[in-house]
From Swiss-Prot:
<dbReference type="GO" id="GO:0005886">
    <property type="term" value="C:plasma membrane"/>
</dbReference>
<feature type="transmembrane region" description="Helical">
    <location>
        <begin position="149"/>
        <end position="169"/>
    </location>
</feature>
<keyword id="KW-0472">Membrane</keyword>
<feature type="transmembrane region" description="Helical">
    <location>
        <begin position="11"/>
        <end position="31"/>
    </location>
</feature>
<feature type="transmembrane region" description="Helical">
    <location>
        <begin position="52"/>
        <end position="72"/>
    </location>
</feature>
<protein>
    <recommendedName>
        <fullName>Inner membrane-spanning protein YciB</fullName>
    </recommendedName>
</protein>
<comment type="similarity">
    <text>Belongs to the YciB family.</text>
</comment>
<feature type="transmembrane region" description="Helical">
    <location>
        <begin position="76"/>
        <end position="96"/>
    </location>
</feature>
<keyword id="KW-0997">Cell inner membrane</keyword>
<dbReference type="InterPro" id="IPR006008">
    <property type="entry name" value="YciB"/>
</dbReference>
<keyword id="KW-1003">Cell membrane</keyword>
<dbReference type="Pfam" id="PF04279">
    <property type="entry name" value="IspA"/>
</dbReference>
<keyword id="KW-1133">Transmembrane helix</keyword>
<keyword id="KW-0812">Transmembrane</keyword>
<feature type="transmembrane region" description="Helical">
    <location>
        <begin position="121"/>
        <end position="141"/>
    </location>
</feature>
<comment type="function">
    <text>Plays a role in cell envelope biogenesis, maintenance of cell envelope integrity and membrane homeostasis.</text>
</comment>
Amino acid sequence: MKQLLEFIPLILFFVVYKLAGIREAAIALIIATIFQMLILKLKYGKIEKQQIIMGIAVVFFGTLTAYFNKVEYLQWKVTIVYALFALILLISQYGFKKPLIEKLLGKEIQLPEKIWNKLNLAWAGFFILCMLINIYISQYCSEEVWVDFKSFGIIAMTFIATLFTGIYVYRYLPKDDQNK
């Protein structure tokens, strides 16, 4: 339910874009994101930091996109958010000597420290890759191609990265955790 709720604003953005254009899609995205945050708060009692960052970015850049009727603001949102996520992961590992991935998932799974470090770097690299692809597509492809990429390409890339992460991590899980 929680994961499905996260996709609703994106799906609504895509549909409204195809029907009406970027200004209306940005407005729909803002409204859906605000409702999503309210539902998360009411149903689960809290909103994760990542969701707060995304929500603030959506409202800020979505408002600029709607007001000026220019897609570039939402395109920069994607770039900035992925750069921020990569930077946070890198700072956690090199600045604080504690990979953020371990802090987020360490209660659920037990892994050797070197694996947490590799995962943290891999996800930082993934976010940098997404950022660079977003920059390329937003600069060299049509607005419609960018909307398709934002709506489906990034989701597919994230799914594949998550799948590879699971396969990689499985080898290092304690034997009793592998059977769960």
